[in-house]
Amino acid sequence: MADAPDHSLNGRRHLEFTPIGYSRQNPLKRLSRSPIQTVAEDDNNGNGMSEEGPFKKQRRADLDDTIASHRMFNDSSQFDDTLPQLNGQSADNDNDNAHDSGKETDDVVKNLMGNLKENAPASNPLKEQQEQLHKLNTDNYNLRLKCNSLLKFLHNVTDQGELTKSLGLLDEIHEWKQKHYTLNQQYLELKAKLIQVEANAAENKQEPVTEVDHTACQRELSYVQNQLEKTTLQLNTYRDEVAHLEDKTIRIQEDQRAKEEQHQLEIQMLRSDVNNLNVSLVNKESELEEDRAKIQRLMNQLHEFDHKGSQSLLDLERQLEMKRDSISSLEKEVRALTHDRVHLETRIKDREIENAKIQSELERLRDNVKNNNSSNFEIGELKHAKASLDDKVRNLTEERHNLNQRISALRKECDEWKSKYQRNESLDSNHRKAFDSLRQELQTTKTQLEETRKTAQQLQTQVIENTTKNSERTSQRIKDKETQIQKLESELQFCKQQLKDGSRRLQAEEERCRETFESELQNLEMKNGFERTKLEREITLLKEERVALIETHDRELELWKSKCDALNKENDILVRQEIGDLDGVKRKLSQQLDKLQEKLTTAEGERGDLAEKLIKLQHSKDSYKDELKRVSSKLEYLSKEYLKSKQSAINDDEQKTKYNTMKQRLLVELKSLQDENLSLERKLLEQRGSSSRSQESSSRSSSTTQDRLDYYKLKYNNEVKHNNDLRIMNDYLNRVLRASSQHLKLDLLKLESEISQPAVPSSRTYKTVLDDDRYRPRFRSGLISPGHIPTFKAVALLVLACVRMKQTAVRCRWDEHRIRYLRNKMAIDDDRITW
């Protein structure tokens, strides 16, 4: 019988933990640590103690310390089906010093290894979901009932129900934050007062109390009075200078504005004249070119028809002379207009240079006016006058625009006449072509006649030569030739008749064209004269308007001058009022100086009182220091607790936002399900109607309906799963909110009780544990931390979770493929159907 292994404290260190369950001797002779080794063991080892007895288990440090310490999970959590159950017993506290404070922590149940059951039932959620999938193959009516019930449930559970408690807790947290802020401000004020008291005490100790001497104050008072008198004198002089400068600037501004407006009006008038002259110049040049073209055409016609009568030549020469006279007169007018334009352009340039100089002077004067900060009202009125003048200028520009429109209309009419003239020219050219063709035909007939005559002569000579040889043959030939000659003579007469008819027609066409050209020329001359008289009248009207505008401008200038004189008088009155106000200010200053002297006497009395108070404050300095220490310790504790409460409040806000977003998402999904349900019912009704109508497509419709049923069943099952998951998450978030709010309430009650208690006694037995070291991972040199050594059970659960996750992922992927396939198949079947 082998001896039992040594299970004492020192012997247990040489054993190694194995997943099978038995312990064997560690061959490395190295200290091995169990993941459930307690903190007390390390403390005992540090102190050199080796006590045997039952050891308490300690949980490993993990990421969920905060959740476990705040009791986030209760018995109804969503993880209770897959995690081992907890015993209802409370965990023992390892720290003995914490029991001396009078606050027990046994009511907080921690998720320790000792509280886990061995044979706790574990659920299989994937299997349950498969069973639910088989059970939930219901029709559309059940789906609608469930959707309506869920909607009613969600409408009943509002934020005004259970969430009002968490909102009240948030309000309490906000109040505690404000209290902490006020306490901190009071603490800082007390600290500043204490520093001031210490500084005043040190100064009073160093400097002995001396009698107050008022000679310096009296000197300062006299100096201030002298300075005040000097400044008032300077102010008066400056005001006189400013008034003088304002008068000067106003006069200069008025002169410059008058000059500027006059120059602008002159420039605008000159520009309008130049524009009109340019327009008339362009028109005259176009008319000149047209007249030249007409003269050229008439000259060509004269050269072509010089064989005609002398009367037409004389008429044409007269027309030519008239046109030359009109051209020479037009050229003279163009030269005069160009000379006027050059003169006007030079005048405009001079005016622009003068305007630039005036504008530079105006800008300089405006800068002076801005520096003086006066006469804004006059400037505004002048701006208003300038705006009115601008309106008048706009009206003139509109009139000019109307005149331009009239000129454009006249140009259009001229273009129409030109097009008509071109048409006549084209007709004339066609007639000429016809005449040329007739001439060519005549020439060809003449050449044929000459050839026939030549042949006749040759035949006569042959007849004379061959009279003796073959008289009969020659006589026959002579007859044939005579008949041919007769035919040719008849053709010649016909051609002559055609030539005469063509010449008559040509003469009539020439006379008609000449008459039309002469009438058009007369009309154009009449129109040009009418337009010239019209433009001269418009120019005279514009000149009269210019004279009227200049007269109105002079009247307005006189009005503005009268207004400026009135404003100067008002300015003098205001200056006198300001001088009176300055005298009143002097009196007030003297009264204030008297009051200051009285305050000085009272301040000396208060200084003596303050010296007495200072002596009293020195005595109470030690008591303030003690109180300050107590307040600082309390403030540090409160700041730590406030940081903790702030972090928990941030978590609560995040969870609340998650809850609201989840709720909205659920409502949206339910609405979409209802819409799908209605569309399903409509499709079912349509399918039933179509099945009664078309018996031939019964097999195809049955397959499509089966596909549709499979598709909507799969989709319905997926939505049910999704809704279940969302409901579980919603319940979990509600429980977390409830637990966190309860924990916050407890913490706040603790804080209130600790603040209401008197100062903490400075004893060794009392020890506040703000940061519990029990859950902190402990490391030893050369070893892995126990928090990183997983147990066999944890690894097995992790593997099982991974397998289940893989199975669910494969099933979800398969469902998605199936839904996609059915959707495509339904779409193809719908495309096949022909209504």
From Swiss-Prot:
**Cellular compartments per GO CC:** cytoplasm; nucleus; spindle pole body
Cysteine-cysteine disulfides: none
Could you tell me where this protein is found in the cell?
Answer: Nucleus; Cytoplasm, Cytoskeleton, Microtubule organizing center, Spindle pole body
List the biased-composition ranges (Polar residues).
Answer: 74-91
The coiled-coil segments of this chain are: 182-690
User: Which spans does this entry mark as compositional bias, Basic and acidic residues?
Assistant: 96-105
Main function: Component of the spindle pole body (SPB) required for the proper execution of spindle pole body (SPB) duplication. Potential role in cross-linking filaments or anchoring other molecules. It is essential for growth.
Q: Which family does it belong to?
A: Belongs to the SPC110 family.
What is the name of this protein? Spindle pole body component 110
Give the gene symbol: SPC110
